[in-house]
Amino acid sequence: MDAVLSVQGASAPVKKKSFFS
């Protein structure tokens, strides 16, 4: 999951922030 989150974050930092929020 970490790898997926890392890729998603790098591709879409906004989406990552939303996921974490």
Swiss-Prot record:
Transmembrane portions of the chain: none
Ranges where the record places region Disordered: 1-21
Membrane topology: Multi-pass membrane protein
Propeptide segments, given as residue ranges: 1-21
Organism for this UniProt entry: Escherichia coli
Subunit structure: Monomer. Interacts with itself to form filaments; also interacts with TraQ.
Keywords, sorted A to Z: Cell inner membrane, Cell membrane, Conjugation, Membrane, Plasmid, Secreted
UniProt lineage: Bacteria, Pseudomonadati, Pseudomonadota, Gammaproteobacteria, Enterobacterales
GO CC terms of this entry: extracellular region; plasma membrane
Record has Ubl conjugation as a keyword: no
Full protein name: Pilin
UniProt family annotation: Belongs to the TraA family.
Function: Propilin is the precursor of the pilus subunit, pilin, that forms conjugative pili, the filamentous surface appendages required for cell-to-cell contact during the earlier stages of bacterial conjugation, and that retract after contact is established. Mature pilin is assembled with the help of TraQ and TraX.
